[in-house]
C-alpha cells in the first residue's frame, strides 16, 4: 500500500469572531476530513464537531481496508452525524437550522473514496494539474450547469452562498460518493469555502506545485486567503501519496 502524509490547519480568518470550521486527520485509519458549520456561531461550530466525532466513532476499531468496507463506513459516518445533529436540534429548538458541509477522504486497499456534501471542496493535484473532484451543492452551481450564468459571474452573484445540501438539513443526508485510484505523488486538498472564495484555483495550484514541505503548503494557502481578505474561517487539509 502506498505511504501517505497528512497536514491540516483551521484559522478563524480576519472577519469572524469564532471558528465554525473543523478538521481531523487519522493517519492510522487512513482518513481526513474538513467541515464548515452553518446555522449560527455556536450551532455551526457544534455541527462540525458532531461530524468529526461521528466519523472518528465510525472508523475506530476496524482494520478492513477494502473499498466496499470504506464506502460503507463513509456512508455510516454521514448518517450518524446527520442523525446526531437532528437529535440535538430536537432537544435544542433554538439551534434550528444548524448543520455543516462535510468532506471526508478515506484511502482503501484499492484507492480513495470521498464523501461530500455542501460547498466545501476536495481537489487532487496530479502531474502538476489541479482538478476539483467535488461539485458544489449550491444555487449558483445549479445555475452554471443549466447555462443560466457564466463562471465569471459566480463571485458577484447575490445568492452565491446559498447551499441546498448539508448535514442536518434533511432526514437522510444527500451525500456524493466519489472513488478513484490513488497514484504516487498525488496531493489531495480538502478545504472550506474560506479558502476557495478568497484564492483562485490557479493560485492554489501554484502553491501545491511548489517544492515546500506539505505543512508549509497548508500555512501558505491559509496566509494567502487572509491576505486576500480572510472574510471567513479557513480550513485546509492535505493528503500526499508517496
Where are these regions (language model features)?
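PP2C/PPM-type serine/threonine phosphatase catalytic domain
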Residues: 1-242
Amino acid at each position: 500500500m502506498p505511504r501517505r502524509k497528512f497536514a491540516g490547519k483551521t484559522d478563524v480568518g480576519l472577519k469572524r469572531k469564532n471558528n465554525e470550521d473543523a478538521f481531523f486527520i487519522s493517519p492510522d485509519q487512513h482518513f481526513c476530513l474538513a467541515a464548515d458549520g452553518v446555522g449560527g456561531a455556536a450551532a455551526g461550530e457544534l455541527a462540525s464537531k458532531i461530524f468529526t466525532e461521528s466519523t472518528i466513532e465510525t472508523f475506530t476499531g476496524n482494520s478492513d481496508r477494502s473499498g466496499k468496507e470504506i464506502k460503507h463506513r463513509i456512508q455510516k459516518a454521514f448518517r450518524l452525524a446527520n442523525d446526531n445533529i437532528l437529535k440535538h436540534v430536537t432537544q435544542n429548538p433554538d439551534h434550528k437550522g444548524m448543520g455543516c458541509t462535510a468532506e471526508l477522504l478515506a484511502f482503501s486497499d484499492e484507492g480513495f473514496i470521498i464523501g461530500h456534501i455542501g460547498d466545501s471542496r476536495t481537489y487532487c493535484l496530479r502531474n502538476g494539474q489541479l482538478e476539483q473532484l467535488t461539485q458544489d451543492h449550491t444555487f449558483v452551481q445549479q445555475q452554471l450547469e443549466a447555462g443560466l450564468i457564466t463562471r465569471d459571474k459566480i463571485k458577484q452573484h447575490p445568492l452565491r452562498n446559498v447551499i441546498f445540501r448539508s448535514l442536518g438539513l434533511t432526514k437522510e443526508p444527500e451525500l456524493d460518493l466519489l472513488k478513484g485510484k490513488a497514484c504516487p505523488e498525488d496531493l489531495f486538498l480538502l478545504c472550506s469555502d474560506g479558502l476557495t472564495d478568497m484564492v483562485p484555483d490557479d493560485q492554489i495550484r501554484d502553491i501545491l506545485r511548489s517544492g515546500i514541505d506539505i505543512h508549509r503548503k497548508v500555512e501558505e494557502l491559509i496566509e494567502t486567503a487572509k491576505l486576500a481578505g480572510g472574510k471567513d474561517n479557513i480550513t485546509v487539509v492535505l493528503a500526499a501519496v508517496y
